[in-house]
From Swiss-Prot:
GO terms for cellular component: cytosol. Mg(2+) binds at S124, D300, D302, D304. It is found in: Cytoplasm. The modification Phosphoserine is found at S124. It catalyses: alpha-D-glucose 1-phosphate = alpha-D-glucose 6-phosphate; O-phospho-L-seryl-[protein] + alpha-D-glucose 1-phosphate = alpha-D-glucose 1,6-bisphosphate + L-seryl-[protein]; alpha-D-glucose 1,6-bisphosphate + L-seryl-[protein] = O-phospho-L-seryl-[protein] + alpha-D-glucose 6-phosphate. This is Phosphoglucomutase, cytoplasmic 2. Its EC number is 5.4.2.2. Its main location: cytoplasm. Alpha-D-glucose 1,6-bisphosphate binds at R25, S124, D304, R305, T368, E387, S389, K400. The active site is at S124. Coiled coil: none annotated. Keywords: Carbohydrate metabolism, Cytoplasm, Glucose metabolism, Isomerase, Magnesium, Metal-binding, Phosphoprotein. GO terms for molecular function: magnesium ion binding; phosphoglucomutase activity.
Amino acid sequence: MGLFTVTKKATTPFEGQKPGTSGLRKKVTVFQQPHYLQNFVQSTFNALPADQVKGATIVVSGDGRYFSKDAVQIITKMAAANGVRRVWVGQNSLMSTPAVSAVIRERIGADGSKATGAFILTASHNPGGPTEDFGIKYNMGNGGPAPESVTDKIFSNTTTISEYLISEDLPDVDISVVGVTSFSGPEGPFDVDVFDSSVNYIKLMKTIFDFEAIKKLLTSPKFTFCYDALHGVAGAYAKHIFVEELGADESSLLNCVPKEDFGGGHPDPNLTYAKELVERMGLGKSSSNVEPPEFGAAADGDADRNMILGKRFFVTPSDSVAIIAANAVQSIPYFASGLKGVARSMPTSAALDVVAKNLNLKFFEVPTGWKFFGNLMDAGMCSICGEESFGTGSDHIREKDGIWAVLAWLSIIAFKNKDNLGGDKLVTVEDIVRQHWATYGRHYYTRYDYENVDAGAAKELMANLVSMQSSLSDVNKLIKEIRSDVSEVVAADEFEYKDPVDGSVSKHQGIRYLFGDGSRLVFRLSGTGSVGATIRVYIEQYEKDSSKTGRDSQEALAPLVDVALKLSKMQEYTGRSAPTVIT
């Protein structure tokens, strides 16, 4: 048992350490500045109640991106100095964001300890590497992201910090080896517990899904499957779950070795960045003679996001959460007794609203940011939720969960084919989606992202959209000049949300233009990029007529896209003639 001491280090504040919707994200080179990470970590410890630090157990892990291993050692030494009793670390510092949430909620240490929170080292879907992005966020005892009351306190602390505590003589712990290393300091014993987090996570998944039913599907010669981890942390779970537990062929796994730079790619599961999977599923530009798999899915860097694909078919995230909600009770044992409610983020399409109305479920529309769903779940008001940015989840944890979404889809496909695995033709992903549209109508939906836009120009564009809302007659006049074939705007506002659980109000959550036929235009500035601003434009049109639900999405939305770009003066403000990404 090694002895360590505590050192007080003098420091000065850094500007801009304000945690966004998912923590603090900056370039690696910013985090590598002396004292930068330490200031943020100490500001977090200082923002927490004393009993969540002194004598407490905290988790420190992440998606394995570049600088994670250094950060784990720094945070561990600071935890020891601040009186933390135990630090739990995923082997090789790898733990998906949903697995961290599960570990906080479910894991009990050998000595009966439970975690009170976690430092998660991730910048999610942002690229990794020496010149790319790093991030850190703090999750609370419920397994969910710190609420604004805590992140505001953290930020306030970063502006006044003058010293931090660190145990510099605490040796680095070998995080590649599972086991407990014990030390002793001024306040008593301190343990570092390195463990394989996939064990806890798989155990939890088995309480939710019928693994035998999914295994029958995955081992059926008729069903083919492909999972792409984009070299993110999902790779640390994929083989255990899909191959060892569910019987899929190992060749069905793509890019499932976690890498510090995600193999030089962009670990964002969408049609632009998951190129290899998109090609394999028959959605790429090159035409291949190889028959695509029946089902494909991808994850982002920290495995909380998912993309679902059928053979030559893309499932929008907005449709995905609606379809899971519509089929959950019959297909997923965890939901067999019914859903408590459903929720979506404001920019997500209203497909879930229609399901909720038809099934008589409680429904909530919340700002972007998973913590808003967490409040509803803690209050027992919501079972399934999702957002258009490829995040889907349920109340089994307090984060979105990419592998959960894949298992949910496999459960639905297995249920639809339970008497059909020996038949001529399987019910496919495309069949399930088209049947859903026939029942509930279709929400044609697209998102245009303009990344790394000049922040000043982005703010001006948004301010102009707000000022236009004061006269809808002028807006409608303008729209008719752009396109005469779109409905009238009947309401326009800046979305604000009053939390039904704690009464807190979140303002300025996105600009909305709502049309008489149920169509919507939404404009948001994103808080998850590390440089410049990202403008996101969400364009949605509802079609109830089942004979018109089979059109190409971009073609169906062309009039509204035209209106959105001209109404916002996108090119004029940003200088961009096209978006960076279209989803």
